[in-house]
Swiss-Prot record:
<dbReference type="InterPro" id="IPR001602">
    <property type="entry name" value="UPF0047_YjbQ-like"/>
</dbReference>
<dbReference type="InterPro" id="IPR035917">
    <property type="entry name" value="YjbQ-like_sf"/>
</dbReference>
<protein>
    <recommendedName>
        <fullName>UPF0047 protein sll1880</fullName>
    </recommendedName>
</protein>
<dbReference type="Pfam" id="PF01894">
    <property type="entry name" value="UPF0047"/>
</dbReference>
<comment type="similarity">
    <text>Belongs to the UPF0047 family.</text>
</comment>
Length: 147
């Protein structure tokens, strides 16, 4: 319920995440810093990756075997075999990276509760780099809600 004295605010920042090739990067703390900077206490945080060969997922952040198993599963589901794909201009890992991105997400929406991300105990927000080479990935964090 929104009180009549509530002030609505929107805030947006672009995070740059350096990857070291294929890997998952938990960046909860960077997102939380944006939420805190916004001053929003109750609202919604939208996170969007500006690339077609990387994606975002919310996944378990406690047991690294979960992330390893996900990576193995996707490697088997979408193999990096240059003979399978027409698009290979940027390398044999490029089209598989596009497919992996299409099968996952480019955005996530997280409630803000009492000025904090409303994630569960074991949840982490991960940038998933699908390419083999290092990249600088841009992630837009948009926060809106009551202050």
């Amino acid at each position: 319920m929104i009180s009549s004295a509530a002030t609505f605010r929107q805030h947006q920042e672009i995070l740059v995440i350096a990857t070291q090739g294929k890997s998952l990067h938990n960046f909860n703390s960077k997102i939380q810093a944006v939420v805190q900077h916004s001053g929003v206490k109750t609202g919604l945080c939208t996170v969007f990756v500006r690339h077609t060969s990387a994606s975002l997922i919310i996944q378990e952040n406690a047991d690294p075997d979960v992330l390893t198993d996900l990576a193995i599963f996707f490697a088997q589901l979408v193999p990096e075999d240059g003979r399978r794909y027409r698009h290979s201009t940027e390398g044999l890992d490029d089209m598989p990276a596009h497919i992996r991105s299409a099968l996952t997400k480019t955005s996530e929406h997280i409630p803000i509760v009492n000025g904090r991300l409303g994630l569960g105990t074991w949840q982490g927000v991960f940038l998933w780099e699908h390419r083999q080479r290092p990249h600088q990935r841009e992630v837009i964090v948009h926060v809106s809600g009551e202050v």
